[in-house]
Amino acid sequence: MNLMLMGLPGAGKGTQAEKIVDAYHIPHISTGDMFRAAMADQTDLGVKAKAFIDKGELVPDDVTNGIVEERLSQADTNVGYLLDGFPRTLDQADALAVITDKLNKPLDGVINIDVDPEILADRLSGRFICKTCGATYHKLYHPTQVEGTCDRCGGHVFFQREDDKPETVKNRLKVNIEMNTPLLDFYEKRNLLYTVDGNQEIDDVFAAVKKVLDTIKD
């Protein structure tokens, strides 16, 4: 099966990707891993990508698309693949369609893990850190045993990273929703989109994902 995974930050894509890869024995291809491998192997495209990344610039589409094509050309994707983090734009989605047709590895399905943005905001903005020892907690999922006291060192001073502050999280989600919506429409029009309710326990989400994948497989 040739698959793509979509979802907003905090939706649990990484966890579901691991479960899909374990159950269906297909390679997990994330954008970050692709770039790191291309740069480590010093391919022509990897060298080009590194030059942009080192300058703190976005890697242009032609380089990104080329790296994706190189990765999907590798033999381990002959049994299928799970794309994660690409495409990010409609232009990249068009390029991916051309690449996968050329390689005769077209997408069989796009799985969107749909979670209420309010729940995601709570998930992402609930993290706090002990200033003394750096132990990490979450107000909902991993609170301190005694309120206001670090389990590890007994410290009483905590802080939040800028990235985890509610306003930052809300802006990040807003940007991602604006970016994802056209892509979801793109794949829905091509009858490739399958949306799974991600507002459930991890195993329940995977059960729903598996049901979709078994349908695609058949």
From Swiss-Prot:
Protein name: Adenylate kinase
GO BP: any one term: AMP salvage
UniProt: AMP binding residues: 31, 36, 57-59, 85-88, 92, 161, 172
NMP, as annotated region: 30-59
Localisation: Cytoplasm
Gene: adk
Cellular component, GO, one term: cytoplasm
Enzyme Commission number(s) of this protein: 2.7.4.3
UniProt remark on domains: Consists of three domains, a large central CORE domain and two small peripheral domains, NMPbind and LID, which undergo movements during catalysis. The LID domain closes over the site of phosphoryl transfer upon ATP binding. Assembling and dissambling the active center during each catalytic cycle provides an effective means to prevent ATP hydrolysis. Some bacteria have evolved a zinc-coordinating structure that stabilizes the LID domain.
